[in-house]
Amino acid sequence: MQTAPREYSTSGPTAVLAPTTNTQHYAPYSLYRFLSSHKLDLLLGIALLVFLYVITAAPKEVCQVVITGESVVIRNCQQPDRILANLNLSPWNGVKFPLL
């Protein structure tokens, strides 16, 4: 960004440099200029917001199917009867999980 040259007046007994009234005033930065000049800051801010969301998000309960030699346990599932009906349990071919 170019700045206008400043003019100083040196008249008077003390010869103090003071800006004259001929200086140009520039419009404030636009949002686009601000964001384009602060890309790293913007990226770090977004990363911080995503990190905070991941940390504070409530954990979602996962549907679990535990099959042991003794039993089949279905936990936290909305339709356990549908899952149990689709499991192909038989001693001669092992356990097969269908794609639901």
Swiss-Prot record:
Residues 1-41 are lumenal. It is found in: Host endoplasmic reticulum membrane. Keywords: Host endoplasmic reticulum, Host membrane, Membrane, Transmembrane, Transmembrane helix, Transport, Viral movement protein. InterPro entries: TGBp3. One of its GO terms (biological process) is transport of virus in host, cell to cell. Residues 60-100 are cytoplasmic. Its main location: host cell. The keyword Transmembrane applies. The chain crosses the membrane at residues 42-59. GO terms for cellular component: host cell endoplasmic reticulum membrane; membrane. Belongs to the Tymovirales TGBp3 protein family. TGBp1, TGBp2 and TGBp3 seem to act together for cell-to-cell propagation. TGBp1 is the main movement protein that physically cross the plasmodesma with the viral genome. TGBp2 and TGBp3 would facilitate TGBp1 function. Plays a role in viral cell-to-cell propagation, by facilitating genome transport to neighboring plant cells through plasmosdesmata. May induce the formation of granular vesicles derived from the Endoplasmic reticulum, which align on actin filaments. This is Movement protein TGBp3.
